């Protein structure tokens, strides 16, 4: 997948315009004329040298360099942030992103336009199209639907995703090898799925049937449960998928899973993350433990998780953004970045279910 942007006028073009204006000056004295011609020649040679040095850089790097020059002259970078929905994980990623950009560029040199799509894909599209119309310098797409909308809205403005699980799946890239190319890069919240399956075995070696609860409208959730299901079956478990279309049927589907299964696994899923109270209200009274794909879900309804820090994920994304805006990096050449994982458990829910965390787990704070 390659995305190209139109280049800016070359340095030679600019020098030619300078030369034209100098030649238009009516200089009568021969000595002054020679000085003027010498000046023209010097400017042209310098411009040609600069063009030769920068000829291999892509148009995205050139655009980023010009944005950096503008900010140095007192113009703020305009950064649009499209966040799919409000919940702890995405909120932390946005904060980490903003903090990193302020640290890297100076708070006075960056202006954020934050928009919450309220978990609506149509709103994601509207937000990103507005960013393009407003001429922002960079777009942060927080969560998969936000990234998909940003990719559809522009092939020119640099787009960074965060809280995106699998970029190949999200963008329909059959040949994805770690770098998207074009105007898109970012960070992934994909945890090691084989280790998540192994964590279920670590906590519940005697369980027989594992329910995989997820939103069918989120392709990254489908990807996760497919992989985890295969890993669980390798470990000898019966693994069954329970999909809900949206928050309206989550309660009924979760009730079915809790009635049928010994343990429930919930992947990194935006709809589940926004509705952990529903899941906890069903599973905890039923005595069915939940293993979660990320810390925000585990904090709301889970026993344990193989967790990443979404704040750190967002901060890494912000550091990438600073490099793009200042011309230090070309977004088309930046690979997707990942973060480290930590084993964590929910002390309150473990106490309620009479569970003791295995060695090596850290209690979730708050």
Where are the predicted features?
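Sec-dependent N-terminal signal peptides of Gram-positive bacterial secreted proteins and lipoproteins
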Residues: 35-56
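Bacterial lipoprotein signal-peptidase II cleavage site
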Residues: 50-69
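Hydrophobic alpha-helical segments within soluble ligand-binding/sensing domains
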Residues: 73, 167-209, 308-329
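Extracytoplasmic "Venus flytrap"
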Residues: 74-98, 104, 113-124, 217-221, ...
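An alpha-beta-alpha
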Residues: 79-81, 97, 185-232, 330-350
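Beta-alpha junction/loop-to-helix N-cap segments that form part of ligand/metal-binding clefts
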Residues: 113-175, 266-284, 288-293
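Pocket-lining segment of extracytoplasmic ligand-binding domains
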Residues: 219-288, 294
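Flexible loop/turn connectors
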Residues: 296-348
């Amino acid at each position: 997948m390659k995305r190209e942007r139109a280049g800016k006028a070359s340095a030679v073009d600019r020098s030619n315009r300078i030369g034209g204006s100098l030649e238009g000056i009516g200089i009568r004295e021969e000595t002054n004329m020679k000085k003027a011609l010498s000046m023209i020649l010097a400017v042209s040679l310098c411009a040609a040298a600069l063009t030769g040095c920068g000829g291999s850089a892509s148009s995205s790097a050139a655009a980023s360099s010009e944005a950096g020059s503008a900010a140095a002259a007192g113009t703020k970078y305009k950064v649009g942030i499209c966040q799919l929905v409000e919940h702890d994980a995405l909120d932390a990623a946005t904060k980490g992103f903003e903090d990193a950009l302020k640290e890297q560029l100076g708070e006075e040199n960056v202006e954020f336009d934050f928009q919450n799509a309220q978990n609506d894909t149509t709103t994601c599209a509207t937000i990103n199209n507005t960013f393009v119309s407003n001429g922002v310098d960079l777009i942060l797409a927080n969560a998969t639907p936000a990234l998909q909308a940003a990719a559809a809205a522009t092939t020119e403005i640099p787009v960074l995703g965060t809280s995106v699980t699998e970029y190949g799946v999200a963008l329909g890239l059959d040949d994805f090898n770690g770098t998207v190319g074009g105007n898109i890069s970012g960070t992934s919240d994909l945890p090691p799925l084989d280790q998540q399956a192994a964590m279920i075995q670590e906590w519940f070696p005697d369980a027989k049937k594992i329910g995989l609860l997820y939103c069918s409208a989120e392709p990254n959730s489908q990807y996760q449960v497919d992989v985890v299901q295969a890993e669980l079956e390798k470990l000898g478990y019966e693994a069954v998928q329970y999909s809900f279309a949206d928050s309206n049927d989550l309660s009924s589907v979760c009730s079915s899973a809790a009635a049928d299964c010994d343990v429930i696994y919930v992947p990194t899923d935006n709809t589940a993350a926004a509705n952990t109270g529903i899941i906890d209200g069903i599973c905890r009274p039923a005595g069915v433990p939940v293993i979660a794909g990320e810390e925000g879900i585990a904090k709301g309804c889970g026993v344990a998780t193989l967790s990443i820090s979404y704040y750190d994920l967002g901060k890494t994304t912000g550091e990438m953004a600073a490099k793009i805006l200042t011309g230090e990096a070309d977004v088309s050449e930046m690979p997707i970045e990942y973060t480290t994982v930590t084993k964590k458990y929910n002390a309150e829910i473990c106490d309620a279910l009479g569970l003791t965390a295995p060695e090596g787990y850290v209690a979730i704070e708050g």
